């Protein structure tokens, strides 16, 4: 019966030899003949396990430094022949060929090779597996008759099935799907490494499951994390991150990287991927106090990111409120011990920058994905243009630079009122830019913050003068925005009429 074929002959060719000796010994004990290649065959022979060299099956030696071993009709015919097609089996017999019922293959470590910073193109090319991929695809295509294994974690389950009589068709199909996913990932990694065009005609995606998640944004949504999140963050304490935690962590870290640790200590407080308070100071404790003062309600259950190692003074201050996550480049031992006392708090160490790590941002849409460059353009104040009669003072210019760094991380429509070292009011996600300004002003009033003498940043142009007039009425004396409205002259005139300074950056920072 198809899918219940007896395994008589196995082919083994593995780079990762984890568990291969034990697995091969178990197959041998079941009376299964083993064919093997190169290093795999030597390892098995040294362990006392009979393994027939593949050249004995093909009648052809390995050539070209091992580049050609299994690429031969004697191997692939044995894999591809359908056992339920008499003509196939007769053809095998006519050529004195034998079916191969089990393939155990894993591939050269291309991804690990190109991860080395000093790798050369020639070294990368040497790690592109050809024969192994062909074996996996041939075996997986004929999965009702041929078992295919790419992962040592599956050895034990297959052995259990073989000892019980056979491996059921459903499991054979699962293993075949895993093999095709393995080769797809492998080829996608190679294509990404060799690709030079920025937006290719075909976008191969290959991410391994990093971890399953309890659920997605909401409990009724299934979810998992793919890729290598652990390359950027090490979790030092707390239960596993949720889907929303991961989104907030990325948003918080992306924002805090706007502020180099060499310039000042910086603290960013995030809720639902939006900043609710950002500040810089001589030390983290003072930066925390200023950031928290922006909004004393929203930070509860939020995410805190800092750009310097956490010390005990900062730890004692943030320990007074509940925060889901604290992200820092490091934690002093006494600070770590204190923060670990709350079991529901997660502590993450940021181990490498996320800015610039990904060439592209992806977002799913019906039928596909949207792809764009991340909005990681550096702040270049020299390219800004003063458009009002009055230029910003030095203090206002410093505040404008600070506000512009923050506003790009606020959901559109975004308005940020700020001083040179802290946010004063943040308006996020309103359909009207004027409403975002009103929200920011209201939040500042709720926090008891005086906006007189503040500056205001807008992530996109002011389409009408009313937004600027509202900002000036709230107390702002300088404004930064991209510019580009058909009513720019009207908007500039409103600023001039109030004696305010306005700067055009020429760069928009929509965030949806």
From Swiss-Prot:
Gene that encodes the chain: purH
Record-annotated membrane-spanning stretches: none
Coiled coil: none
Keyword Transferase assigned: yes
Domain-related comment: The IMP cyclohydrolase activity resides in the N-terminal region.
Domain MGS-like: start-end pairs: 1-150
Catalysed reaction equations from the record: (6R)-10-formyltetrahydrofolate + 5-amino-1-(5-phospho-beta-D-ribosyl)imidazole-4-carboxamide = 5-formamido-1-(5-phospho-D-ribosyl)imidazole-4-carboxamide + (6S)-5,6,7,8-tetrahydrofolate; IMP + H2O = 5-formamido-1-(5-phospho-D-ribosyl)imidazole-4-carboxamide
Keywords noted in UniProt: Hydrolase, Multifunctional enzyme, Purine biosynthesis, Transferase
GO MF annotation terms: IMP cyclohydrolase activity; phosphoribosylaminoimidazolecarboxamide formyltransferase activity
Pathway: Purine metabolism; IMP biosynthesis via de novo pathway; 5-formamido-1-(5-phospho-D-ribosyl)imidazole-4-carboxamide from 5-amino-1-(5-phospho-D-ribosyl)imidazole-4-carboxamide (10-formyl THF route): step 1/1; Purine metabolism; IMP biosynthesis via de novo pathway; IMP from 5-formamido-1-(5-phospho-D-ribosyl)imidazole-4-carboxamide: step 1/1
UniProt xrefs under NCBIfam families: PRK00881.1, purH
The organism's taxonomic lineage, starting at the top: Bacteria, Bacillati, Chloroflexota, Chloroflexia, Chloroflexales
Any GO CC annotation of this UniProt entry: cytosol
PROSITE patterns linked: MGS (PS51855)
GO biological process: 'de novo' IMP biosynthetic process
Stored SUPFAM superfamilies: Cytidine deaminase-like (SSF53927), Methylglyoxal synthase-like (SSF52335)
Protein's UniProt name: Bifunctional purine biosynthesis protein PurH
Enzyme Commission identifier(s): 2.1.2.3, 3.5.4.10
PANTHER family given in the database record: BIFUNCTIONAL PURINE BIOSYNTHESIS PROTEIN ATIC, BIFUNCTIONAL PURINE BIOSYNTHESIS PROTEIN PURH
Family: Belongs to the PurH family.
């Amino acid at each position: 019966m198809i899918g219940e074929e007896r395994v008589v002959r196995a082919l083994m060719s593995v780079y990762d030899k984890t568990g291969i000796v034990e697995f091969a010994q178990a197959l041998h004990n079941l009376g299964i003949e083993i064919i093997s290649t190169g290093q795999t065959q030597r390892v098995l022979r040294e362990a006392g396990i009979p393994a027939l060299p593949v050249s004995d099956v093909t009648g052809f030696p390995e050539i070209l430094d091992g580049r050609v071993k299994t690429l031969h009709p004697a191997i692939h015919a044995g894999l591809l022949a359908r056992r339920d097609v008499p003509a196939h089996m007769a053809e095998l017999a006519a050529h004195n060929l034998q079916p191969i019922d089990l393939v155990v293959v894993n591939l050269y470590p291309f991804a690990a090779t190109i991860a080395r910073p000093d790798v050369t193109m020639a070294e990368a090319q040497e790690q592109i597996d050809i024969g192994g991929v062909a074996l996996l695809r041939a075996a997986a295509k004929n999965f009702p008759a041929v078992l295919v294994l790419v992962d040592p974690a599956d050895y034990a389950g297959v052995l259990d099935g073989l000892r019980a009589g056979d491996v059921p068709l459903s499991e054979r199909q699962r293993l075949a799907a895993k093999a095709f996913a393995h080769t797809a990932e492998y080829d996608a990694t190679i294509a990404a490494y060799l690709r030079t065009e920025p937006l290719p005609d075909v976008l191969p995606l290959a991410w391994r499951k990093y971890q399953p998640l309890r659920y997605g944004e909401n409990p009724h949504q299934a979810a998992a994390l793919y890729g290598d999140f652990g390359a950027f963050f090490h979790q030092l304490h707390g239960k596993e991150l949720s889907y929303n935690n991961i989104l907030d962590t990325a948003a918080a870290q992306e924002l805090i990287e706007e502020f180099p640790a060499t310039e000042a200590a910086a603290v960013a407080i995030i809720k639902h991927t939006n900043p609710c308070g950002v500040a810089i100071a001589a030390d983290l404790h003072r930066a925390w106090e200023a950031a928290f003062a922006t909004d004393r309600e929203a930070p509860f259950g939020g995410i805190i990111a800092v750009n310097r190692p956490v010390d005990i003074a900062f730890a004692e201050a943030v320990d007074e409120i509940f925060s889901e996550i604290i992200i820092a480049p490091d934690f002093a031992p006494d600070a770590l011990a204190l923060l670990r006392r709350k079991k529901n708090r997660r502590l993450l160490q940021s181990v490498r920058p996320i800015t610039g790590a990904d060439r592209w941002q992806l977002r799913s849409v019906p039928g596909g994905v949207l792809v764009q460059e991340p909005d990681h353009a550096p702040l270049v104040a020299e390219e800004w243009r003063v458009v009002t009669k009055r230029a910003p003072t030095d203090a206002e210019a410093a505040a404008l630079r600070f506000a512009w760094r923050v506003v790009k991380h606020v959901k559109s429509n975004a308005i940020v009122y700020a001083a040179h070292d802290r946010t004063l009011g943040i308006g996020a996600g309103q359909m009207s830019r004027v409403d975002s300004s009103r929200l920011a002003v209201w939040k500042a009033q709720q926090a008891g913050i005086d906006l007189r003498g503040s500056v205001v940043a807008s992530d996109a142009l002011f389409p009408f003068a009313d937004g600027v007039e509202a900002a000036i009425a709230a107390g702002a004396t300088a404004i930064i925005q991209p510019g580009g409205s058909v009513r720019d002259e009207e908007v500039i005139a409103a600023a001039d009429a109030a004696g305010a300074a306005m700067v055009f950056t020429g760069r928009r920072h929509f965030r949806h």
